[in-house]
From Swiss-Prot:
The gene is rpmC. Keywords: Ribonucleoprotein, Ribosomal protein. SUPFAM superfamilies: Ribosomal protein L29 (L29p) (SSF46561). One of its GO terms (biological process) is translation. InterPro entries: Ribosomal_protein_uL29 (IPR050063), Ribosomal_uL29 (IPR001854), Ribosomal_uL29_sf (IPR036049). NCBIfam families: L29. GO terms for molecular function: structural constituent of ribosome. GO terms for cellular component: cytosolic large ribosomal subunit. The keyword Ribonucleoprotein applies. This is Large ribosomal subunit protein uL29. Belongs to the universal ribosomal protein uL29 family.
Length: 72
């Protein structure tokens, strides 16, 4: 399954952009939940895709912060 944005594209983002992208995806997830509750959602597969993207971005964010705090 090919996502609209891949992990390679996420790795190019800096920490501020990652945070903005996470916020945007969480808003999208909220909107999907609202549509599902009102029975307007036909594309339930988007839950899995967005959750996976959020998890990937959170992992990248933690890795970047760990690499910045670790002395070489």
């Amino acid at each position: 399954m090919k996502n609209s944005e891949s992990l390679k594209e996420f790795k190019k983002l800096n920490s501020e952009q990652i945070t903005e992208k996470i916020d945007q995806l969480r808003k999208d997830l909220f909107d999907l939940r609202f549509k599902q509750a009102t029975r307007q959602l036909n594309e339930t597969h988007k839950f899995k895709i967005i959750k996976k993207q959020v998890a990937q971005l959170l992992t990248l964010s933690k890795n970047q912060s760990a690499s910045q705090t670790t002395p070489d």
